[in-house]
């Protein structure tokens, strides 16, 4: 059994290596056309889907203290695409043999609560999410104090959000450098959120 397991693991590693080669080739092709890899991603977090609810964190609670360097929060440190890794299960082909591929991403945080204090050394400290490049946060609450000792982008729900935050509540103390806000230090789309915060300058 051990020899079969070793063979299987070796085969899976070889497949992973080949996927990385293909990804590098596609990146090179994109660079030749002048297109950015980020242009190939579509955020579908705000769309209702009929399939299984993947890409979702729901009903999580934190009561412990969280300390870190960057992208620090009570529930999720970062909602972002890591371009160094291969996205899984979301490649959509157009046509029979197309290199015109698109990735769809979904990242949802729903009905989560943070009661623990959050301290980041640098940018992006939030009660629920530190850095939110994409996705949706809804029906979340934060009651823990949020601070950045040497950075900015501090918020009761998110340090910075380019996604959507809606129907969320905040009651806490906030402190840091630039860009401090009750819901988000920097926020793109904020809907029906409520705050009762004290901001230290």
What would you call each of these model-derived segments?
Residues 1-201:
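Surface-exposed loop/turn motifs in large extracellular/passenger domains
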């Amino acid at each position: 059994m051990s020899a079969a397991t070793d063979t299987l693991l070796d085969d899976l590693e070889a497949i992973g290596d080949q996927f990385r080669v293909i990804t590098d080739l596609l990146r090179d092709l994109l660079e030749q056309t002048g297109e950015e890899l980020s242009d190939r991603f579509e955020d579908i977090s705000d769309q209702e889907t009929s399939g299984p609810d993947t890409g979702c964190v729901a009903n999580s609670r934190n009561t412990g203290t969280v300390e870190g360097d960057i992208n620090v929060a009570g529930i999720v440190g970062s909602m972002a695409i890591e371009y160094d890794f291969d996205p899984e299960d979301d490649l959509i082909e157009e046509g029979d043999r197309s290199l015109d591929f698109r990735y769809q991403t979904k990242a949802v945080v729903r009905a989560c609560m943070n009661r623990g204090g959050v301290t980041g050394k640098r940018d992006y400290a939030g009660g629920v999410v530190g850095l939110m490049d994409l996705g949706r946060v809804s029906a979340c609450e934060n009651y823990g104090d949020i601070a950045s000792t040497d950075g900015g982008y501090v918020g009761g729900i998110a340090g910075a959000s380019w996604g959507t935050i809606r129907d969320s509540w905040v009651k806490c103390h906030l402190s840091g450098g630039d860009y401090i806000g009750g819901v988000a230090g920097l926020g793109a789309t904020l809907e029906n959120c409520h705050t009762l915060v004290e901001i230290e300058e």
